[in-house]
Swiss-Prot record:
The keyword Protein transport is assigned to this record: yes
Keywords per UniProt: Chaperone, Disulfide bond, Membrane, Metal-binding, Mitochondrion, Mitochondrion inner membrane, Protein transport, Translocation, Transport, Zinc
InterPro entries in alphabetical order: Tim10-like (IPR004217), Tim10-like_dom_sf (IPR035427)
SUPFAM superfamilies listed in its UniProt record: Tim10-like
Family stated for the protein in its record: Belongs to the small Tim family.
Membrane topology listed for this record: Peripheral membrane protein
Gene Ontology cellular-component annotations: mitochondrial inner membrane
Name this polypeptide is given: Mitochondrial import inner membrane translocase subunit TIM13
Signal peptide limits: none
Lineage of the species this protein comes from: Eukaryota, Fungi, Dikarya, Ascomycota, Pezizomycotina
Species in which this protein is naturally found: Gibberella zeae (strain ATCC MYA-4620 / CBS 123657 / FGSC 9075 / NRRL 31084 / PH-1)
Subcellular location(s) of the protein: Mitochondrion inner membrane
Length: 82
């Protein structure tokens, strides 16, 4: 393996680890934000209203996350000249 291949492998591994951290962060924020908003009094199960609220909240949060991520990636590409 030459130095170019080693560098590419390291970059790929770092990107995968960063993606994993981002996914974990997203899940944690979804749980915190949506659960606090939609489930004021936790019980043994979610009511239909709580389930609907959680679904809606998660969809909105994911859409916002994707929008921010896309803008961030576009900016990185622009700055790197791609």
């Amino acid at each position: 393996m030459d130095s170019t291949q080693v560098k590419a492998a390291v970059i790929k591994q770092v990107q995968q680890e960063a993606n994993l951290v981002n996914a974990r962060t997203l899940i944690e924020k979804l749980q915190e934000t949506c659960f606090e908003k939609c489930v004021p009094k936790p019980g043994t199960s979610l009511s239909s209203g709580e389930t609907t609220c959680m679904t809606s909240c998660m969809e909105k949060y994911m859409a916002a996350w994707n929008m921010v991520n896309s803008a961030y990636i576009a900016r990185l590409r622009q700055e790197s000249g791609h």
